């Protein structure tokens, strides 16, 4: 949507260092963003729960029924493990490398733009506490528990708002 393309445009202009998202759909990369931290994983990458082999999304889409790993094991048999998306389900831990990368970017930012989130899902909502830069801009239609931390609050759709910023 417009927000994904606007963020990619800001990155291309050198004004955005990273996108930190809870979305698992891969749309930030599809829009052109390069530095994306997917806190809850992605459906674009999939893996065998038994042997760990990685598979593209097409394997899931083209599968009839539950996708199974067809890799031959050391005995010549087929692995047959279930192939599932690399996503974080409720009560599962987040990837430490993704979280530490996100924290690094938040700590080093002079401005933090938070958009399209109610800031209620933890631990992602708690990442705001790592920001020590100058300005927080919050773009969300409804109030959040972090509104008091924001220097600017915009209660408009995020796509149109970011698109207007990129065009100026």
Per-segment meaning from a language model:
Residues 1-168:
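Conserved catalytic alpha/beta core of Sir2/sirtuin-type deacylases, generalized to analogous enzyme cores
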């Amino acid at each position: 949507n417009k927000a994904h393309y606007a963020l990619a445009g800001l990155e291309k202009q050198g004004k955005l260092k990273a996108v930190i998202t809870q979305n698992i759909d891969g749309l930030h990369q599809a829009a052109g963003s390069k530095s994306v931290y997917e806190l809850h994983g992605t459906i674009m990458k999939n893996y065998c729960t038994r042997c760990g082999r990685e598979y593209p999304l097409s394997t899931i889409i083209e599968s009839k029924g539950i996708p199974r790993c067809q890799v031959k094991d050391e005995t010549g048999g087929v692995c047959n493990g279930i192939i599932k998306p690399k996503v974080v389900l409720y009560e599962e831990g987040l990837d430490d490398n993704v979280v530490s990368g996100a924290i690094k970017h938040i700590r080093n930012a002079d401005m933090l733009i938070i958009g399209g989130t109610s800031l209620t899902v933890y631990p992602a909502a708690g990442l705001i506490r790592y920001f020590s830069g100058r300005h927080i801009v919050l773009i969300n239609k409804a109030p959040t528990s972090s509104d008091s931390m924001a220097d600017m609050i915009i209660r408009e759709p995020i796509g149109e708002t970011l698109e207007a910023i990129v065009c100026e």
